[in-house]
């Protein structure tokens, strides 16, 4: 399955919520009718069956983190092998991706932009350049923007906006040096309540 390159607003309307596919500070509500599905007949959102609700939740989570279907299944398989709650393990794996950590630290305005920074070798991890977006960052790892990318306007703008909104508690960011420490994976209570990972677990448990 190819990565989706179409309108981001369409995906958010499809899931009925902001998937954070656009820059921070740019509310989708002013331009997207999130309470209406896309398409000519999208005026009313139909009542979903249990299976449809589970499928939609999986698609929503996959799209938030920009994960392809096969890779998402692999994450679920790994989450189910670990001790503890499979759903929370899944969120931990997704949140620990290098591209997501770059986004959480405010070095990019979207996860897609963060993925691009990593792929273009603009990110150092513990002093070494790493271009694998899916790399699992560990507690205490240091993530920083390489010197060649520190002058990029998009990086400066993203940091400025994130600083205004506030950084997540599980990262410690030095804005001036464009460097951050991944203190730990976030607790479930620190993540949004608009994600129902249990529906994803129910879907894959069938």
From Swiss-Prot:
GO terms for molecular function: rRNA binding; structural constituent of ribosome. GO terms for cellular component: small ribosomal subunit. It comes from the Bacteria. Residues 96-161 form the S4 RNA-binding domain. CDD domains: S4 (cd00165). Keywords: Ribonucleoprotein, Ribosomal protein, RNA-binding, rRNA-binding. One of its GO terms (biological process) is ribosomal small subunit biogenesis. One of the primary rRNA binding proteins, it binds directly to 16S rRNA where it nucleates assembly of the body of the 30S subunit. With S5 and S12 plays an important role in translational accuracy. Belongs to the universal ribosomal protein uS4 family. Part of the 30S ribosomal subunit. Contacts protein S5. The interaction surface between S4 and S5 is involved in control of translational fidelity. This is Small ribosomal subunit protein uS4. It comes from Methylococcus capsulatus (strain ATCC 33009 / NCIMB 11132 / Bath). The gene is rpsD.
């Amino acid at each position: 399955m190819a990565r989706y390159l179409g309108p981001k607003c369409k995906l958010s309307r499809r899931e009925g919520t902001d998937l954070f596919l656009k820059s921070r500070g740019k509310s989708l509500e002013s331009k997207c009718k999130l309470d209406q599905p896309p398409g000519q007949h999208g005026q009313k959102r139909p009542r979903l069956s249990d299976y449809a609700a589970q499928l939609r939740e999986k698609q929503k989570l996959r799209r938030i983190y920009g994960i392809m279907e096969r890779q998402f299944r692999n994450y679920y398989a790994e989450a189910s092998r670990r001790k503890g709650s499979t759903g929370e393990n899944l969120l931990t794996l997704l949140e620990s991706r290098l591209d997501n950590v770059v986004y959480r630290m405010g070095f990019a305005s979207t996860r897609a932009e963060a993925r691009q920074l990593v792929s273009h070798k603009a990110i150092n991890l513990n002093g070494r350049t790493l271009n694998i977006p899916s790399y699992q960052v560990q507690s205490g790892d240091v993530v920083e923007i390489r010197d060649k990318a520190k002058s990029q306007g998009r990086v400066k703008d993203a940091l400025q906006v994130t600083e205004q909104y506030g950084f997540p508690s599980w990262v410690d960011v030095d804005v001036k040096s464009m460097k951050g420490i991944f203190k730990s994976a976030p607790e479930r209570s620190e993540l949004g309540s608009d994600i129902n990972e249990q529906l994803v677990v129910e879907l894959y448990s069938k």
